[in-house]
Amino acid sequence: MTLSHLECVRCAARFPVADHPRGCPDCDTAGRNANLFCVYDDTTAPTERLPYVTAPALGEGDTPLLRLPWLEGASVKNEAANPTGSHKDRFAAMVVAHAAASGYERVAISSSGNAGLALAAYAAAAGLRCTVAGYTRLPEPVRERLADLGADLHLFATDAERVGLIRELAARPDTLAVSNIAEPFVGCHPIGIEGYKRIAWEIAGQAAEEVRHVVVPTSRGDLAWGIHRGFAELPGTTPPRLHLVEPFPRLAAVLAGAPVGGHFPGDSGRLSSIAGHTTTVQAHRAVMLSGGSAMVVSSDTADEWYARLCGRGHVWERSSVTVFAAYERLRAEGTIGAGEHAVLVATSHFFKGL
């Protein structure tokens, strides 16, 4: 593996490999925030295009692709099978490897739960300190597990306060901020996002038929962008269409003509893992480049699907089960045609109270 440079998802400007907690420096200066992504030299094999090609740190990855007998035309990628119970372990494994290799002593993140738990676990495994800036409504099980893992937890009422702490820590030479400090947000650290490419590679290897659609819960598009990049880099495959699911129109509003850097009012209800009032350029690009869509699934609808799935023994959190509601609608409206196979990404289990 040879990581060549970082490139902006918006303006395509190139930068040497370094840490940019505000995203693309050029776009940041111009007041139009956008994230960066990793680019490798042409001699690197597609499935080695990762910043750190190492054995799994805690056993993350290789999660099952489930065929449910009652779910016609789709499989479920069960990311709840990761060590701390969510897809965020893939991000944490990669970004903590980077922090350790770069000589940082602490990693810091603004998180609604899953990312903080993942980062705390992988930081502990690497002997690094971890600071998590969370909301005051963070469920007690998450608080307890963060304490068990040795994380420093700080709770705030607003995004601005959470980002303020991460911004302060990012100014310290011993700390790597892995969630961005720009407003509006651009997404998380690009080296961590590379870990999500493995989801695409695993799906391609596990699926018995061509996957034409992938349905993904989303907040700021880290997962969706990583999955898109993973499929796009695989030779001989047509990247599937990505359908990003949100609790109220954010990306959907952008696709209808609203500016990507806007503030979008709405109520996330109990969908804390995909909450937030902004979207990102990387989320928009993932949809546009794949020919996908944005799907709105309310908290009430997620509650209905949560109950249905629990009744069948499935233990995914509410934000995860939004993909089932979105898939049902995509099939009904013909966006996913008869005979086209889809993968629904179930991102986390329900045991954390999220």
Task: Indicate where each model-derived feature is located.
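Positively charged, low-complexity intrinsically disordered leader regions
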Residues: 43-105
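Active-site/ligand-binding loops adjacent to catalytic centers
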Residues: 163-178, 233-318
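N-terminal juxtadomain amphipathic helix
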Residues: 1-65
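Small/polar-residue-rich loop-to-helix segments that shape phosphate-bearing ligand pockets
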Residues: 131-210, 268-284
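A glycine-rich, Thr/Ser-enriched phosphate-binding loop motif common to dinucleotide/cofactor-binding enzymes
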Residues: 80-96, 184-200, 317-322
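Phosphate-binding loop/pocket of nucleotide- and phosphate-handling active sites
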Residues: 261-268, 322-354
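A short, small-residue-rich loop immediately preceding and capping a beta-strand
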Residues: 95, 103-122, 126-135, 211-223, ...
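Alpha-helix C-terminal capping segments
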Residues: 97-103, 117-129, 229-234, 325-335
